[in-house]
């Protein structure tokens, strides 16, 4: 009898436990439990004991106690982020012997009650720890961090750390990734990272560092120093081993010169944008070096670097960003050693000239951004830049270039010349005036922008034998497009823009461009289009701010199967006679922009929304017009008859008077 009673009690206990679990609002899937954003004040005590993943983020937890957290000994992932935790009971995580990932981000660990003896305590199997956003300061951090022999990733971002010492990181022998971004770090003591022999990724961005003069982390592969106040960067003078650094970010600092990178031969990514760099450069002649404010990485005065020596070891560099600096000149000797470079950004500098004349110069370069400088001259050698695919030159002052400047670039696919003063030559039979640039015969070029170049005449054959797919000739007021100017593009052109040119007549046989998908003719003075009588590929047609009153079906019929979007605002559209357009609106085959606000006019000059026009409105208008014509015709015929009758009467009266006198 007694065993039966015990069994009954056990079943009742399990039933009550199951009933209590059913009342918990957390979501449970397999061994994963999510209690995110439920307003909980404490860790639930009725969850399955075999839970491996527990998400308690976004609640109102203020303290973490060993019980009931210790009940869930199978936990591997524990997320306690975005709470109000200010108290950690000693040994709170001691029972979680399988815990691998722990997040305490965005809590209140900096409050005094979080500093109970032992801090976090030992975390023997934790590989990922997030303590970001807790207002932690340097002294507190050393007391909070415990032994973590398996830790690979540690985030201390968005805290209040001002200094790193040789005691900050200890008992973390396998740490690989350390995130310290968005603190207030001003000093890094010598040996601060000596206890991290496997550290490969270090993020120190958005701090208050002013100088790096003794960088000695040979094992590091990725270093982010962006958004500080660094004036100089220099490696240790006698490193114990070869540096492994491949990724270095120094953007948004106060660098005055190109850093000395002679000891970093493996570097493949270098970002120096948004600094004060000039080439060639260095400290003023009377300078004795730039001194750091304290010991450590910033301990020694910096020697004046040589830009030539700095560039020489960068033979493996793939990406170099020097945008937003004060560079006025790029010496040839600086570029000649960058034999692996694929991406070079020199935009937003003070360049007036750029030269790459040497044979084999920058052989691997695929993208060159020289936009928004003050370039007046551009000299590219016949065998230079052999791999260049994208050349960005917008926002410069280029004019009177050598005619074959771009024809020599054998791999060029995309060219942006917006905002210059470049005039295209014509085809072989019409070369054009002195100073024009040839765009014909560039067999690799697919995309060309000549926006805002003050082009007056686009000559016949300007792009002959150049298989362009995108051509933008917008914002050239007064542009005259000669007959045959776009000849040769009929089988390749997909995007054509002629916006804002003041065109009254379009001397382009558009229906012949069988691949054309996007056509922009906005902000001109056009009133007629060529007739598309056969099916084409056009999907988007922009006719805004022109002089169109009618879009007859006889001209637009060929677009019915392909056209998807039509822009018509700003045209004096007629409400009647636009049967094709009305059909598109009512059938929904074409997305006409802002149909509720698209205005049209009746013959009486009455303006209404085009979408509100009904067929009978035009029929009434037609009947009114017919009646008016009939009345006018009757009046005219009556006037003619009366005039004729009066004339006959006058003639007969004259004859009668003559006979009477006789």
UniProtKB/Swiss-Prot annotation:
Membrane spanning residue stretches: 626-646
Bilayer topology annotation: Single-pass type I membrane protein
Major subcellular location class: membrane
Gene3D superfamilies per the UniProt record, alphabetical: Ribonuclease Inhibitor
Pfam families, per the entry: LRR_8 (PF13855), LRRNT (PF01462)
Chain ranges on the Cytoplasmic side, renumbered to this chain: 647-662
Keyword Cell membrane: yes
Sequence ranges of the LRR repeats: 50-73, 74-95, 98-119, 125-145, 150-171, 174-195, 198-219, 220-240, 244-265, 266-286, 316-339, 340-361, 364-385, 387-408, 411-432, 444-465, 467-488, 492-513, 515-536, 537-558
Keyword Membrane attached: yes
Keywords tagged on the record: Cell membrane, Disulfide bond, Glycoprotein, Growth factor binding, Leucine-rich repeat, Membrane, Repeat, Signal, Transmembrane, Transmembrane helix
Coiled coil: none
Residue ranges of domain LRRCT in the record: 571-620
GO CC, any one term: nucleoplasm
Cleavable signal peptide: 1-17
Family statement drawn from the similarity comment of this UniProt entry: Belongs to the LRRC32/LRRC33 family.
Assembly and oligomerization: Interacts with TGFB1; associates via disulfide bonds with the Latency-associated peptide chain (LAP) regulatory chain of TGFB1, leading to regulate activation of TGF-beta-1. Interacts with TGFB2. Interacts with TGFB3; associates via disulfide bonds with the Latency-associated peptide chain (LAP) regulatory chain of TGFB3, leading to regulate activation of TGF-beta-3. Interacts with LAPTM4B; decreases TGFB1 production in regulatory T-cells.
PANTHER family: SLIT RELATED LEUCINE-RICH REPEAT NEURONAL PROTEIN (PTHR24373), TIR DOMAIN-CONTAINING PROTEIN (PTHR24373:SF275)
Protein name per Swiss-Prot or TrEMBL: Transforming growth factor beta activator LRRC32
Species lineage: Eukaryota, Metazoa, Chordata, Craniata, Vertebrata
């Amino acid at each position: 009898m007694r065993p039966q009673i015990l069994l009954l009690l056990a079943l009742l206990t399990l039933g009550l436990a199951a009933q209590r679990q059913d009342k918990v609002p957390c979501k449970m899937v397999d061994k994963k439990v999510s209690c995110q954003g439920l307003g909980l004040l404490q860790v639930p005590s009725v969850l399955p004991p075999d839970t491996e993943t527990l998400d308690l983020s976004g609640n109102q937890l203020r303290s973490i106690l060993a019980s009931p957290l210790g009940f869930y000994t199978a936990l591997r992932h524990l997320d306690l982020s975005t709470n109000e935790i200010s108290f950690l009971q000693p040994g709170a995580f001691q029972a979680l012997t399988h815990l691998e990932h722990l997040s305490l981000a965005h809590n209140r660990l900096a409050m005094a009650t979080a500093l109970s003896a032992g801090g976090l305590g030992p975390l023997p199997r934790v590989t990922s720890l997030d303590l970001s956003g807790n207002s932690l300061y340097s002294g507190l951090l050393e007391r909070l961090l415990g032994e973590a022999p398996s830790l690979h990733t540690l985030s201390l971002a968005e805290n209040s750390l001002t200094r790193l010492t040789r005691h900050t990181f200890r008992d973390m022998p396998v740490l690989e990734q350390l995130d310290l971004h968005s603190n207030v770090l001003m000093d890094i003591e010598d040996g601060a990272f000596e206890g991290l022999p496997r550290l490969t990724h270090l993020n120190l961005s958005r701090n208050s560092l002013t100088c790096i003069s003794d960088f000695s982390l040979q094992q590091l592969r990725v270093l982010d120093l962006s958004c500080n106040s660094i004036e100089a960067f220099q490696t240790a003078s006698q490193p114990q081993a070869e540096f492994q650094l491949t990724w270095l970010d120094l953007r948004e600092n106060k660098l005055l010169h190109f850093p000395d990178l002679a000891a970093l031969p493996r570097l493949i990514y270098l970002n120096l944008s948004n600094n004060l760099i000039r080439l060639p450069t260095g400290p003023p002649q009377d300078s004795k070096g730039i001194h750091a404010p304290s010991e450590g990485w910033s301990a020694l005065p910096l020697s004046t670097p040589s830009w030539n020596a700095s560039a020489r070891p960068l033979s493996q560099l793939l990406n170099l960003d020097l945008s937003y600096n004060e560079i006025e000149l790029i010496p040839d000797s600086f570029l000649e050693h960058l034999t692996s470079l694929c991406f070079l950004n020199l935009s937003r500098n003070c360049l007036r000239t750029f030269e790459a004349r040497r044979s084999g110069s920058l052989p691997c370069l695929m993208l060159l951004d020289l936009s928004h400088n003050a370039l007046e001259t551009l000299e590219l050698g016949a065998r230079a830049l052999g791999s260049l695919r994208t050349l960005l030159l917008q926002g410069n002052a280029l004019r009177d270039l050598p005619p074959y400047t771009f024809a020599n670039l054998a791999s060029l696919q995309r060219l942006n010349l917006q905002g210059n003063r470049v005039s295209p030559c014509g085809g072989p039979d019409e070369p054009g005036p002195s100073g024009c640039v040839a765009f014909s015969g560039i067999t690799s070029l697919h995309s060309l922008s000549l926006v805002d170049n003050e082009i007056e005449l686009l000559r016949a054959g300007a792009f002959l034998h150049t298989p362009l797919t995108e051509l933008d000739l917008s914002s050239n007021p007064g542009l005259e497009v000669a007959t045959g100017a776009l000849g040769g593009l009929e089988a390749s052109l997909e995007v054509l823009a002629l916006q804002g040119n003041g065109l009254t007549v379009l001397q382009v046989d558009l229906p012949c461009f069988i691949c054309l998908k996007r056509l922009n003719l906005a902000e001109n003075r056009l009133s007629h289009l060529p007739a598309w009588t056969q099916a084409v590929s056009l999907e988007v047609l922009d006719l805004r701010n022109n002089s169109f009153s009618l879009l007859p079906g006889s001209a637009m019929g060929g677009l019915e199967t392909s056209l998807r979007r039509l822009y018509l605002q700003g045209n004096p559209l007629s409400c009647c006679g636009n049967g094709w357009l009305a059909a598109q609106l009512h059938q929904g085959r074409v997305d006409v922009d802002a149909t509720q606000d698209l205005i049209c006019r009746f013959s009486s000059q009455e303006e209404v929304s085009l979408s509100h026009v009904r067929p009978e409105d035009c029929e009434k208008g037609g009947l009114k017009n017919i009646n008016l014509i009939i009345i006018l015709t009757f009046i005219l015929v009556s006037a003619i008859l009366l005039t004729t009758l009066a004339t006959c009467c006058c003639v007969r009266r004259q004859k009668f008077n003559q006979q009477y006198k006789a």
